Design a protein with these regions (language model features):
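Conserved N-terminal entry element of GNAT/NAT acetyltransferase domains
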Residues: 1-11
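Conserved beta-strand in the GNAT
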Residues: 51, 57-66, 79, 84
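Conserved GNAT acetyl-CoA-binding A-motif
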Residues: 106-118
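Conserved acetyl-CoA-binding loop-helix of GNAT-fold acetyltransferases
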Residues: 91-104, 131
Length: 146
């Protein structure tokens, strides 16, 4: 099977929401909230939602946000979140390709680093991210849920 990686466009909202149900089905946004957030994301040049599309089906996605910065010679940094692959399409390299493209976008944006957060603690997921070039030794993440 072959797939393509592209930035999500206005018409991809329903596909993204469907994919996100595999991340957090319990807190899906209302249609109004989703539409408002989608409009804000689409108008922000620093926010990239990448899609992995296989045979016309949006099978995987991740979000990359480039953050302007006043340290590190004013070079921005980037965050990757919401990495998800439809269960029927796992193990085909989609997520690896998405992460590779996200890192390329960060590099093209002049970022000095890209960070990735995951809520998964299982070895398979953590080893997947390590295999994609990320490490868990350089930084310690803390989260305060609001």
């Amino acid at each position: 099977m072959s797939f393509t990686i592209r930035e999500a466009g206005l018409s991809d909202l329903a596909d993204l929401l469907s994919l996100y149900s595999f991340l957090h089905a319990e807190d899906a946004p209302s249609p109004e909230a989703a539409g408002s957030a989608w409009a804000a994301i689409q108008s922000d040049p620093n926010h990239h939602l990448l899609l992995g599309v296989e045979e016309g089906f949006a099978a995987a996605s991740c979000a990359l946000v480039v953050v302007p910065n006043l340290t590190r010679a004013a070079r921005p940094y980037a965050l990757i979140e919401n990495v998800v692959t439809h269960p029927d399409f796992r193990g085909r390299g989609l997520a690896t390709a998405l992460l590779r493209r996200a890192a390329e976008l960060a590099r093209e944006s002049g970022c000095y680093k890209v960070m990735l957060l995951t809520g998964h603690r299982d070895d398979a997921t953590l080893n997947f991210y390590r295999g994609a070039g990320f490490n868990s030794e350089d930084k310690t993440a803390f989260i305060q849920w609001l």
